[in-house]
A protein has these predicted regions:
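Transmembrane beta-strand segments of Gram-negative outer membrane beta-barrel proteins
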Residues: 4-22, 42-47, 157
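Residues on the lipid-exposed face of transmembrane beta-strands in outer-membrane beta-barrel proteins
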Residues: 14-18, 32-38, 69-73, 103-107, ...
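Transmembrane beta-strands of outer-membrane beta-barrel pores
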Residues: 18-22, 40, 51-55, 87-91, ...
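Glycine- and aromatic-enriched membrane insertion/assembly motifs of diderm outer-membrane
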Residues: 27-88
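Repeated loop/turn-to-beta-strand initiation elements of outer-membrane beta-barrel proteins
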Residues: 41-47, 78-81, 113-117, 151-157, ...
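Detector for outer-membrane/organellar transmembrane beta-barrel domains
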Residues: 114-165
């Protein structure tokens, strides 16, 4: 989600998605995400959270939480320095806990109120608890690209892709991507459509390498 405007100070944004069915199949899925961002002189602080829970025929089918903290400081007109911490949990890929601590540079191209292209290059330390598979601590590279475009009808398209390789074994890689479209309903509320992809080249036994997620919902920004 994009914050509302570029005025200094605090701003918030978020989204809510829900789906369900009853009858031949009983399914419920609810997800909530949000951000709070402070823009100061040549720096910003960002807090992001996300949570999803679902049930299918009385059995849990989704249970995932995420918290992301990021500090970004302007170095030049086209370059930022950023560092971040992230915590994540996802029962359905046998991920009891994942902690990331990283830093890197972000390069900006053609940034204006209606569009912007960002390229990030850096790395992070990762501590991951996979339950019966134990805990691992490794370093990963972190390369990402993000593009945002708002057209004349105020419809916003955002696409992001991350590639994260183990530093001493590049064949061990993780990829994360997402595409979202927001259509304004009012000045502060949008209709949302999103598609997300997560790929792990070496998942635990019994876990698929690639996950796709499709969602529709309502977003807000203030």
């Amino acid at each position: 989600r994009e914050r509302a405007g570029a005025v200094s100070g605090w701003a918030t944004a978020g989204s809510f998605e829900a789906s369900g069915s009853n009858g031949n199949s009983d399914k419920t899925d609810v997800s909530l995400s949000g951000l709070a961002q402070y823009l100061g002189d040549n720096f910003s602080n960002l807090i992001v959270f996300g949570s999803e829970y679902g049930e299918s025929s009385g059995n849990k089918s989704a249970d995932e939480q995420l918290l992301h903290l990021r500090h970004t400081r302007t170095l030049t007109v086209l370059t930022d320095w950023e560092y971040f911490y992230q915590w994540q949990q996802n029962d359905f890929i046998q991920l009891e806990e994942r902690d990331l601590l990283g830093t890197g540079l972000r390069f900006k191209y053609g940034v204006n109120p209606n569009s912007g292209l960002y390229l990030g290059i850096g790395g992070f330390y990762e501590s991951e608890n996979r339950g019966v598979d134990g805990t691992s601590q490794i370093g990963r590279s972190n390369v990402y690209i993000s593009y945002r475009k708002t057209n004349d009808k105020k419809i916003t398209f955002v696409g992001t892709a991350y590639l994260q390789n183990k530093l001493d074994e590049f064949s061990d890689r993780r990829a994360v991507g997402g595409l979202s479209v927001s259509v304004p309903a009012t000045d502060n509320f949008d209709f949302l459509i999103s598609v997300d992809l997560e790929h792990d080249s070496r998942p635990p036994v019994g876990i698929e390498k690639t996950d796709w997620t499709y969602k529709t919902g309502i977003g807000w920004k203030f």
